């Protein structure tokens, strides 16, 4: 939890409590339904929560913004972002029902009011959103093809509507077809831990 406060020191008391509660909740649920590698659960705050919050180093969502988290798994990046941006509406979607159940139970336990959930494949989701966020679910080209239909034409943030992905490693080849509308941000510029040396936030305007 200290690592979250290190980089986000201005959290409200409620946000601090919500972030602090995540550890025991994920330990408990992960023992029943595996949503995080058992070897990695001890690194929950660095590898999952802070990594999710890396998106906030690229954009500050305005109140009323609608965001879909595609392939949310156990709730990443959607749940940490929903805590950080309580006036933004998050819709968490995953094709695996038991993972959606974990994310739903965790969100309910910490009292999140700005999240909805859906057990469905991405192709089935028809709602419009300002942004789609995702964490290394599939190659960028496949992701853009699927979510183009979900991006609202109305812009209400400083950044044009589009896709924001958390990815790692070498991305030049993957982003090449979209290079004129894509920005790659290295999280090593924001977070000093070794884990973030190869981690990126990829924004594609759609």
UniProtKB/Swiss-Prot annotation:
Belongs to the methyltransferase superfamily. RNA methyltransferase RsmG family. InterPro entries: rRNA_ssu_MeTfrase_G, SAM-dependent_MTases_sf. The lineage of its organism: Bacteria, Pseudomonadati, Bacteroidota, Bacteroidia, Bacteroidales. The keyword NAD does not apply. One of its GO terms (cellular component) is cytosol. Pfam families: GidB (PF02527). Its EC number is 2.1.1.-. It comes from the Bacteria. This is Ribosomal RNA small subunit methyltransferase G. S-adenosyl-L-methionine binds at residues 71, 76, 122-123, 135. The keyword Iron does not apply.
């Amino acid at each position: 939890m200290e690592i979250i406060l290190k980089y986000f020191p201005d959290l409200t008391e409620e946000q601090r409590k919500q972030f602090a509660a995540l550890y025991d909740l994920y330990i408990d649920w992960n023992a029943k339904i595996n949503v995080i590698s058992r070897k990695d659960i001890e690194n929950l705050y660095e590898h999952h929560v802070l990594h999710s919050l890396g998106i906030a180093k690229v954009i500050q969502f305005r109140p009323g913004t609608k965001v879909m988290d595609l392939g949310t798994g156990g709730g990443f990046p959607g749940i940490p972002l929903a805590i950080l941006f309580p006036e933004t509406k998050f819709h968490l979607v995953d094709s695996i029902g038991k993972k959606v159940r974990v994310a739903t139970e965790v969100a309910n336990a910490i009292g999140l009011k700005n999240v909805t959930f859906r057990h469905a494949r991405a192709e089935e989701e028809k709602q419009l959103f300002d942004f789609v966020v995702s964490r290394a679910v599939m190659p960028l080209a496949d992701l853009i093809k699927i979510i183009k239909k979900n991006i609202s034409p109305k812009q209400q943030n400083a950044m044009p509507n589009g896709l924001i992905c958390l990815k790692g490693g070498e991305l030049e080849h993957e982003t090449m077809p979209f290079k004129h509308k894509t920005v790659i941000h290295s999280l090593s510029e924001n977070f000093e831990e070794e884990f973030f040396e190869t981690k990126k936030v990829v924004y594609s305007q759609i």
